[in-house]
Amino acid sequence: MKNIVITGGAGFIGSHVVRLFVNKYPEYHIINLDKLTYAGNLANLKDIEDKPNYTFVKGDICDFDLMLKLMQDYKVDGIIHLAAESHVDRSIKDPFTFAQTNVMGTLSLLQAAKIYWESLPEGYEGKRFYHISTDEVYGALQMTHPEGIPAPFTTKASSGKNHEAYGEEFFLETTKYNPHSPYSASKASSDHFVRAFHDTYGMPTIVTNCSNNYGPYQFPEKLIPLFINNIRHRKPLPVYGKGENVRDWLYVVDHARAIDIIFHKGKIAETYNIGGFNEWKNIDIIKVVIKTVDRLLGRKEGEDMDLITYVTDRKGHDMRYAIDSRKLQKELGWEPSLQFEEGIEETVKWYLENQEWMDNVTSGDYQKYYDNMYSNR
């Protein structure tokens, strides 16, 4: 049996990865390590919590002694590292916490893995440290075509008539790092540490940089779930600047699929970009979300457009992110399965049908669930 630690497994992306691995690989023991900060929620995994190949461990990746004990106690063969502080606005207000968790936490985990794996007779053979990062480490791309041009590459799941590019440059795996926010700077630093442990000690590592994710179980401080909830309750929709900033979007289930493929088939010491093969201006996304929520709630489609409220732009707000995922597509055969419009439809339906989850997360009541389930164990 392989013993795999997934850090941040109670979070948004992490919970989807944990669920996929627990269900797909019954011969694996999946250890979900999560500190359970505000964005971690064990209720995300109620459907698999009693599976025999699943274990939850509450812990902080910054606690080196705990990380080493975890490696030794569970005889860990692989690590999928998702635990991170990830909200840009929070990083602007509190950069220290982001450096502590994203940089020092990653270093703590790397060092614990190094010590344990090097103590084994087989050393690093059959081991793997997979670090999940962001496309924000690359900085910003110019929006040279604000009117949109035909996208130079596509997939079956690329957004139909709206599949456009807003510039001629894209982030490649070889693009130089140029982070602009405390969040992206902390992730860039952690990426460098992971690669340094391969180059210096021979640790088998892989790094991926992914575009914006959306889908079920995302904490409602992020754009799409926040706006779904606000539209439902007819609250203002704060839009930075003119809403012209461009992002590439990926449905979270497709990201989990990519992580699975890369963990098992990716080449050691390689970097892979993971993206949705689409670009959207923020204001256009918001309009799609409004129309979808209105329609599914039985309102006149688009009647809540007046909720859009333009606010002062974020400091250092990067104009355009656009990721080229063709390396992953060509080498490992992965590509997104859902068009953006299809993913938004599924996402809006989920949030509207799971209002209790939303209410519990925003009120903090989900912490009671953890206490009831684990405090006496």
What is each model feature region?
Residues A43, Q142, Q218, L250, ...:
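Short, well-ordered secondary-structure micro-motifs
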Residues N41-N44, D94, F219-L223, I285, ...:
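Residues at alpha-helix caps and immediate loop-helix transition turns in enzyme cores, especially N-
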Residues Y74, A84-E85, F170, G215-P216, ...:
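Intrinsically disordered, low-complexity segments enriched in polar/charged residues with Gly/Pro
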Residues I4, V17, I30, G59-C62, ...:
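C-terminal substrate-binding subdomain of Rossmann-fold SDR/epimerase-dehydratase oxidoreductases
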Residues M1-N213, F263, N282, E346, ...:
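N-terminal Rossmann-like NAD(P)+-binding domain of SDR-like oxidoreductases, especially those catalyzing
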Residues P179-S186, P216, P220, I224, ...:
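The catalytic Tyr-centered alpha-helix of NAD(P)H-dependent dehydrogenases
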